[in-house]
Amino acid sequence: MEQGQDTPWTQSTEHTNIQKRGSGQQTQRLEHPSSTRLMDHYLRIMSPVGMHKQIVYWKQWLSLKNPTQGSLRTRVLKRWKLFNKQEWIN
């Protein structure tokens, strides 16, 4: 992704803070946004039904007990594909 693009995703994941040095040069410093700002953005773009599905999905993902890395990747990919397919149907 190019730096010049101005998308909601880049706005929500990083905040550009421009500071002036003593010599007058401008430098950009990337800061992490606050978690509440990210959550507000997420709540605005998600419907209540979509948010509920996402919460259920992550609770199931977090409940996995020490799976091997390969099986974890397989289960997550299957779940994610199923979740995305259901989103398109609904």
Curated annotation (Swiss-Prot):
Native source organism of the sequence: Influenza A virus (strain A/Hong Kong/212/2003 H5N1 genotype Z+)
Gene Ontology CC entries for this record: host cell cytosol; host cell mitochondrial inner membrane; host cell nucleus; membrane
GO biological process: symbiont-mediated perturbation of host apoptosis; symbiont-mediated suppression of host cytoplasmic pattern recognition receptor signaling pathway via inhibition of MAVS activity
Protein name (Swiss-Prot/TrEMBL): Protein PB1-F2
Alphabetical list of InterPro entries matching this protein: Flu_proapoptotic_PB1-F2
Known function: Plays an important role in promoting lung pathology in both primary viral infection and secondary bacterial infection. Promotes alteration of mitochondrial morphology, dissipation of mitochondrial membrane potential, and cell death. Alternatively, inhibits the production of interferon in the infected cell at the level of host mitochondrial antiviral signaling MAVS. Its level of expression differs greatly depending on which cell type is infected, in a manner that is independent of the levels of expression of other viral proteins. Monocytic cells are more affected than epithelial cells.
Composition bias, Polar residues: 1-28
Organism superkingdom: Viruses
